[in-house]
Each structure stands twice: as C-alpha cells, then as structure tokens.
Curated annotation (Swiss-Prot):
GO cellular component, one term: cytosolic large ribosomal subunit
NCBIfam families xrefs: rpmI_bact (TIGR00001)
Domain of life, per lineage: Bacteria
GO biological process: translation
InterPro entries given in the database record: Ribosomal_bL35 (IPR001706), Ribosomal_bL35-like (IPR021137), Ribosomal_bL35_CS (IPR018265), Ribosomal_bL35_sf (IPR037229)
Keyword Ribosomal protein on entry: yes
Gene of this entry: rpmI
Organism lineage: Bacteria, Bacillati, Actinomycetota, Actinomycetes, Mycobacteriales
Pfam families (alphabetical): Ribosomal_L35p
Record-annotated membrane-spanning stretches: none
Gene Ontology terms, MF aspect: structural constituent of ribosome
Protein name: Large ribosomal subunit protein bL35
Amino acid sequence: MPKAKTHSGASKRFRTTGSGKVVRQKANRRHLLEHKPTKRTRRLDGRTVVAANDVKRVKKLLNG
C-alpha cells in the first residue's frame, strides 16, 4: 500500500500540540478590520482548540 499523503490544505490550517490537541487560527481577522471593534479583534487573536466533533476528521487529514 502506498504511503498516505498529508492533506496540504489542512497542514496549513491546523497544528498538533505536544499533548495531541489540534489547534487552529480564529476566523474573521484577515481584512476589513477597520469597522470591527478593537475588543473583537483582540478576542479573535491567537489560536484556539478545534471542536471535539472535528478532531478525528482533522487528524485523519494530517495523518496523525
């Protein structure tokens, strides 16, 4: 059987932590930030853990 390839789109969007959690960037912080409140842009900063229902699917794409 051939080697499984990592899904290149998923590898750019998700990372696995040392403890095995899958993390992602938060949405709505790319552009058009001028009219969004500073409070909202701060809240959308940084990474967050992927929802429990999606973890299995994402790990499969990452061959994890």
